Amino acid sequence: MTRMHGLLLIGAAGAELVESLGKFDGRAILRRLPAVLLPAVGSLAYLGLNAAVAGAPFAFTVMQEHWSQGLCWISDTLWYVLQNALSYYDEAIRVQIWIPTLLLFAAFFPLLWYAHKRFRSMYTLYAFAYLVLNYSLSWLLSAGRYLSCALPFFLFAAALTEKRPRLTALLAGGMGVGFLANLWCYLLGGQIM
């Protein structure tokens, strides 16, 4: 996990550590701190790779400017995603990128709301921050790819389908159809992000 996701995971692990201890215990936290900070190794490796390849650890920020990529408010992102889903000039790109990006948010946010009282706060906190950070990009083309790594949401979906075999079959079938459609579009040269 690199850049923001690895650092985000540190926050979630820290919240889980404090919650699992039941109280704030400085000594116990210090003993476990190396494990909590372990995801930072990925971020440091990413920065080191940037330094080795491009000469500066934060060179990726300059490279992202070429794609008009940066952080922006989630409301601004959702607004341009909605506009592009409704009226992007290339219908294939609208169907392959913008509409799925909007539908994924529409599916993931209610799932997060469902889970907020059923799961430990670490899971919902991490999932919320993950969703908001991924939808706070100035040119979001890869929401599906980003959300495919949002593991807490898969736990939430599993809890939603627990003891509901019809819903389980419906979701599994829908995901299978979605996977096949994604693969088909990819094989035909579609804009699969």
Protein language model regions, located:
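Membrane-lumen/periplasm interface segments of specific transmembrane helices
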Residues: 2, 6, 10-108, 114, ...
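Hydrophobic/aromatic-rich transmembrane helices and adjacent perimembrane loops
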Residues: 2, 8, 141-161
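Membrane-interface junctions at the ends of membrane-embedded or membrane-associated helices
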Residues: 17-31, 157-172
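Juxtamembrane membrane-interface segments at transmembrane alpha-helix termini
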Residues: 21-23, 72-76, 137-143, 158-164, ...
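Transmembrane-helix signature of polytopic, lipid-linked glycan biosynthesis machinery
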Residues: 47, 125-142, 176-192
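Long, hydrophobic alpha-helical transmembrane bundles and adjoining juxtamembrane helices/loops
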Residues: 93, 103, 187-193
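Transmembrane alpha-helix segments characteristic
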Residues: 114-136, 146, 170
